From Swiss-Prot:
Protein species of origin: Pseudois nayaur (Bharal)
Gene that specifies this protein: MT-CYB
Cofactor: record remark: Binds 2 heme b groups non-covalently.
Compartments where found: Mitochondrion inner membrane
Transmembrane segments: 33-53, 77-98, 113-133, 178-198, 226-246, 288-308, 320-340, 347-367
Positions with a binding annotation for heme b b562: H83, H182
Domain of life from the UniProt record: Eukaryota
Protein name: Cytochrome b
């Protein structure tokens, strides 16, 4: 009698994805982040569900409902902080996952890569809308500033912004629809993640060398299930350290002040994971130009497969490209720092230089480095 996991229609799918999946024998811990993202998403959906049971999406009661969750609901505080800091862990894993893809040339799996970019955009949209829900000062003004960017679109901009707002300013209608979208998007993300996995399993995983690994495969279970459990344990440890010791470390103190349309905070800034894009947006004096740069800073990932000029897939044996990659990482960290600083000298010029560097490294320096390495292969 054959095993039920290989014959049952549903079990067969699980088996082929997580048990008998042929995986390269040499994938490193950088390949853990996919499963960690799955854990993050599940955690966010579960904690979010329990928060939604007590939250009210009304401008008059939203702030106090969040306070009520923290003070009066059984373990409400831990659910709230797991959800808030879970978003930070989610983005750490996302950035690591994308960085891994860039370093090891995983972007040559076109469908998987493009679905991944859509997932990144969807996650960013979800996080932004979630940040608006507590209805603190930063929630309100963040929503006002970011939605206002759409008014830079010629001709239809103003109408579009008012349509999204559901009125002439960020108000009750805006909060209600943001809650609705924030609730539904994670389920769309989950569906997209399944498609992402479907496309990945058409080709199989890449590996650190970038060389096809068809001749050397091992079953996913038990080798990578145990490795994923270790990664998950470390993720939960990091998250709980954050939640139980410094839950407000990554938040903004301004968000503990209820939203007041008559009082603008001195420095409007998004959560830390958007600061790099915010710095790029602010570095361009023109509104439309800034918005385009903001979108392109993420959309540039679509071009990665077409900017790949190297004869080798991975950067493992390409020291010049490795240097370029780490300069890019340093540049992104610089942009993240600048995004949180006030708009004054010397931060303005540093932000502008870092923004120019960002696009220059990806569009010019990395392809040139690859071409030089191709020439060096002939030596």
């Amino acid at each position: 009698m054959t095993n039920i996991r290989k014959t049952h229609p549903l079990m067969k799918i699980v088996n082929n994805a997580f048990i008998d999946l042929p995986a390269p024998s040499n994938i490193s811990s950088w390949w853990n982040f996919g499963s960690l993202l799955g854990i993050c998403l599940t955690l966010q959906i579960l904690t979010g569900l329990f928060l939604a049971m007590h939250y009210t999406s009304d401008t008059m009661t939203a702030f106090s409902s969040v306070t009520h969750i923290c003070r009066d609901v059984n373990y409400g505080w831990i659910i709230r902080y797991m959800h808030a800091n879970g978003a930070s862990m989610f983005f750490i894993c996302l950035f690591m996952h994308v960085g891994r893809g860039l370093y090891y040339g995983s972007y040559t799996f076109l469908e998987t890569w493009n679905i991944g970019i859509i997932l990144l955009f969807a996650t960013m949209a979800t996080a932004f809308m979630g940040y608006v829900l507590p209805w603190g000062q930063m929630s309100f003004w963040g929503a006002t500033v970011i939605t206002n960017l759409l008014s830079a679109i010629p001709y239809i901009g103003t109408n579009l912004v008012e349509w999204i707002w559901g009125g002439f300013s960020v108000d009750k209608a805006t909060l209600t629809r943001f809650f609705a979208f924030h609730f539904i998007l994670p389920f769309i993300i989950m569906a997209l993640a399944m498609v992402h996995l479907l496309f990945l399993h058409e080709t199989g995983s890449n590996n650190p060398t970038g060389i096809p690994s068809d001749t050397d495969k091992i079953p996913f279970h038990p080798y990578y299930t145990i490795k994923d459990i270790l990664g998950a344990a470390l993720l939960i440890l990091a998250l709980m350290l954050l939640v139980l010791f410094t839950p407000d470390l990554l938040g903004d103190p301004d968000n503990y002040t209820p939203a007041n349309p008559l009082n603008t905070p001195p420095h409007i800034k998004p959560e830390w994971y958007f600061l790099f894009a915010y710095a790029i947006l602010r570095s361009i004096p023109n509104k439309l130009g800034g918005v385009l740069a903001l979108i392109l800073s993420i959309l540039i990932l679509v071009l990665m497969p077409f900017l790949h000029t190297s004869k080798q897939r991975s950067m493992m044996f390409r020291p010049i490209s490795q240097c370029m990659f780490w300069i890019l990482v340093a540049d992104l960290l610089t942009l993240t720092w600048i995004g949180g600083q006030p708009v004054e000298h010397p931060y303005i010029i540093i932000g502008q230089l870092a923004s120019i560097m960002y696009f220059l490294i990806i569009l010019v320096m990395m392809p040139v480095a690859s071409s030089i390495e191709n020439x060096l292969l002939k030596w």
